[in-house]
Amino acid sequence: MRKSKVLALLLCLISGYSCAQDSSVTITTQTGNTLGLTISGYQYKEPSLDVKIDAPLVGVDYAGTYAFGNDWFVKADARYVYGSAKYTGSGTQSNIPYSYYDLRGLVGYDFSFSKLGGFVLAPFTGIGYRYLFDNQGGPTSSGANSYNRSSNYVYLPIGVTHRMKVNDTHKLETVFEYDYLIQGTQVSHLSQAAPYLPDVTNQQFRGYGLRLSSMYQFSEWSVGPYVTYWNIQNSNAVTNVITVNGNNYRLTAYEPANNTIEAGIKVAYSF
């Protein structure tokens, strides 16, 4: 038994103390892939109209990272979320198919700090695109007709990842992010509510998003909470002339200020 221990020690010394290194988790950004599953609660509000949409959501996401070896890295991630929503406003409406996807390309840089136990700060930025489809067309409980709506955001993510060792095999990764809205495009299919109404496209130029997540990683698995928030201001106004019973009317439509919050739990596998 003693000879086996001596032999193992010699092998470690010959390999340049790699035995000790193998048991220690790496906190710098690494090349690899991650698949994730999320379960969350979602709420969308238009305060001025007292409109609210609530939904439990299930999502899947993928992230691919390439580290260049000189502290720079690039990352691409994609996320798809689906759920069944409830509308409260002009009456109520349930079991609304509700989904969105989010695509992003990012570039960042690792700053390593050996003091305070050792940690990495990795600021990043890039470009993001979010598409949401609200399949709400149909009558509400009050008899009012609702309509389908799609939402497009092009945004600039600016954030930082904080990564630290918990012990030799576990680490904690926390991400803080601010999303600057470059342009939002809202398409409202008003013709579903009434045949004399036109479909309307509105543009949004003022708004922002916030993201916070914290993932505890052990081996290839990680788990943790996340929160996403959007705050979007009034869109531009679009005016159309509509004809009802032979009479012409001017219809001005805009997308009201709104906010969205989603909070949930994520489980991920890295490979």
Show where each model-derived region lies.
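Outer-membrane pore/translocation modules
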Residues: 83-159, 252
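Short glycine/proline- and aromatic-enriched beta-strand/turn motifs that initiate or cap beta-hairpins
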Residues: 21-90, 268-270
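Transmembrane beta-strands of outer-membrane beta-barrel pores
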Residues: 39-45, 78-86, 111, 127-133, ...
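Detector for outer-membrane/organellar transmembrane beta-barrel domains
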Residues: 129-201
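Residues that define the transmembrane beta-barrel architecture of outer-membrane proteins
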Residues: 31, 52-60, 72, 82, ...
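Extracellular loop and loop/strand-boundary signature of outer-membrane beta-barrel proteins
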Residues: 43-52, 85-97, 139-149, 188-204, ...
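Predominantly the C-terminal beta-signal and adjacent terminal strand-loop region
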Residues: 196-271
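Short loop/turn motifs that connect adjacent beta-strands in outer-membrane beta-barrel proteins
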Residues: 21-31, 66-74, 111-121, 165-172, ...
